[in-house]
Swiss-Prot record:
Pfam families xrefs: adh_short_C2
GO MF annotation: an example: 3-oxoacyl-[acyl-carrier-protein] reductase (NADPH) activity
Recorded name of the encoding gene: rhlG
Protein name per its UniProtKB record: Rhamnolipids biosynthesis 3-oxoacyl-[acyl-carrier-protein] reductase
Binding site for NADP(+): 14-38
Catalytic activity: a (3R)-hydroxyacyl-[ACP] + NADP(+) = a 3-oxoacyl-[ACP] + NADPH + H(+)
Family: Belongs to the short-chain dehydrogenases/reductases (SDR) family.
Active site: 162
Highest taxon listed in the record's lineage: Bacteria
Swiss-Prot/TrEMBL keywords: NADP, Oxidoreductase
Binding site for substrate: 148
EC number(s) reported in the record: 1.1.1.100
């Protein structure tokens, strides 16, 4: 592997790493040489995924429910017992909620905002000591937040809280990038369009819906796991050392 993309000796944590985009990124980081911890609320699924991903490198599971500040604190404590530092934090855990406008529940809105925005803030806050231990001017620590093209473009689909939550995450990331750059901690956002995941499987499993959805994307298709992994590796590697405060769409041109 070219040294520009090697993550040998680096320690990474991927939240929501048991499936979907989180699993894609975790596998990519492992293949690039990083030691990777994944966390998810479902302890069994998290452990099963870590076992599968161990075929690519050193992967360990940390069960964690990030729906509260206490959960983020427990995650940081658990990671601190396993590693003295954290080089790469990927905040991927998230959720959505869909319902008609007239019946959209406030409880659903609050759940989406809590997990997609507040929990990311709490995770960064609680993991700052470990990130600071790895940060240097030559090789900054990296925070990679997983936003969405829905935070850039008005996608609708009755997911009224999802787009606003991702737009809020994008802005939070810019603010943190500005604040933490002096401590050699870089904060960037990956804003995916369509990728295979639990959140999009209802479309993927319907051939007509998949065809119509793909037609709305300028490149005419969904993203592939290796494309998501490659972008994360770039941000975690040499290219990401001189980047902070960016929101990077990976959506086949959907945001244009």
């Amino acid at each position: 592997m070219h040294p520009y993309f090697s993550l040998a000796g680096r320690i990474a944590l991927v939240t929501g790493g048991s499936r979907g985009i989180g699993q894609m990124i975790a596998q990519g980081l492992l293949e690039a040489g990083a030691r990777v911890f994944i966390c998810a609320r479902d302890a069994e699924a998290c452990a099963d995924t870590a076992t599968r991903l161990s075929a690519y490198g050193d992967c360990q599971a940390i069960p964690a429910d990030l729906s509260s500040e206490a959960g983020a604190r427990r995650l940081a404590q658990a990671l601190g017992e396993l590693s003295a530092r954290l080089d790469i934090l990927v905040n991927n855990a998230g959720t959505s909620w869909g319902a008609a406008l007239e019946s959209y529940p406030v409880s659903g809105w609050e759940k989406v905002m809590q997990l997609n925005v507040t929990s990311v803030f709490s995770c960064i806050q609680q993991l700052l000591p470990l990130l600071r231990r790895s940060a240097s001017a030559e090789n900054p620590a990296r925070v990679i937040n997983i936003g969405s093209v829905a935070g850039i473009s008005a996608m609708g689909e009755q997911a009224y809280a999802y787009g606003p939550s991702k737009a809020a995450l994008h802005q939070l990331s810019r603010m943190l990038a500005k604040e933490l750059v002096g401590e050699h901690i870089n904060v960037n956002v990956i804003a995916p369009g369509r990728f295979p995941s639990r959140m999009t499987r209802h479309i993927a499993n319907d051939p007509q819906a998949l065809e119509a959805d793909s037609a709305s994307i300028p490149m005419g298709r969904w993203g592939r796991p290796e494309e998501m992994a490659a972008l994360a590796i770039s941000l975690a590697g040499t290219a990401g050392a001189y980047m902070t405060g960016n929101v990077i769409p990976i959506d086949g041109g959907f945001h244009l």
